[in-house]
């Protein structure tokens, strides 16, 4: 008895998501195809959607002359102990906040700059 398309569809519908993912990868390898959608060229040039960054890192690039003030702010922002905050301030560039939202990153940057540090937000 020959296997029909309906038999294949019924079998595939019974697979888990992980099994489906593995099956797609095997199809891509065996037949040299990609599961990515093909972009259709139109008469007008399509605008590329720019993905807005949602997670930011706050990095001290220079502690400046007022290191004690910067250390205090680093401790307040991170909850680090005195030694860890001092090390983070002296061993620049040093990431103070990682994976935070834009507002938190900008507030941290403002506080650190007011204390005398030079800061980057990436």
Curated annotation (Swiss-Prot):
Example GO biological process: translation
InterPro entries: Ribosomal_bL12, Ribosomal_bL12_C, Ribosomal_bL12_C/ClpS-like, Ribosomal_bL12_oligo, Ribosomal_bL12_oligo_N_sf
GO terms under cellular component: cytosolic large ribosomal subunit
GO MF entries: mRNA binding; structural constituent of ribosome
Superkingdom, natural source: Bacteria
One family name in Pfam for this protein: Ribosomal_L12
Keyword hit for Ribonucleoprotein: yes
Secreted in keyword set: no
Keywords: Ribonucleoprotein, Ribosomal protein
UniProt cross-references to Gene3D superfamilies, sorted A to Z: 3.30.1390.10, Single helix bin
SUPFAM superfamilies, alphabetized: ClpS-like, Ribosomal protein L7/12, oligomerisation (N-terminal) domain
Chain's role: Forms part of the ribosomal stalk which helps the ribosome interact with GTP-bound translation factors. Is thus essential for accurate translation.
HAMAP family: Ribosomal_bL12
Oligomer status and interactors: Homodimer. Part of the ribosomal stalk of the 50S ribosomal subunit. Forms a multimeric L10(L12)X complex, where L10 forms an elongated spine to which 2 to 4 L12 dimers bind in a sequential fashion. Binds GTP-bound translation factors.
Protein family (similarity comment): Belongs to the bacterial ribosomal protein bL12 family.
Name of the protein: Large ribosomal subunit protein bL12
Organism: Sulfurimonas denitrificans (strain ATCC 33889 / DSM 1251)
Gene: rplL
């Amino acid at each position: 008895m020959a296997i029909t398309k309906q038999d294949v569809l019924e079998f595939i519908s019974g697979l888990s998501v992980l099994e489906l993912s593995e099956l797609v990868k095997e199809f891509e390898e065996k037949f040299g195809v990609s599961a990515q959608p093909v972009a259709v060229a139109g008469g007008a040039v399509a605008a590329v959607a720019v993905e807005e960054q949602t997670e930011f890192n706050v990095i001290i690039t220079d502690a400046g002359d007022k290191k004690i003030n910067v250390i205090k702010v680093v401790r307040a922002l991170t909850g680090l102990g005195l030694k860890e905050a001092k090390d983070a301030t002296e061993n620049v560039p040093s990431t103070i906040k990682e994976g935070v939202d834009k507002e938190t990153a900008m507030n941290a940057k403002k506080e650190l700059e007011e204390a005398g540090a030079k800061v980057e937000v990436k």
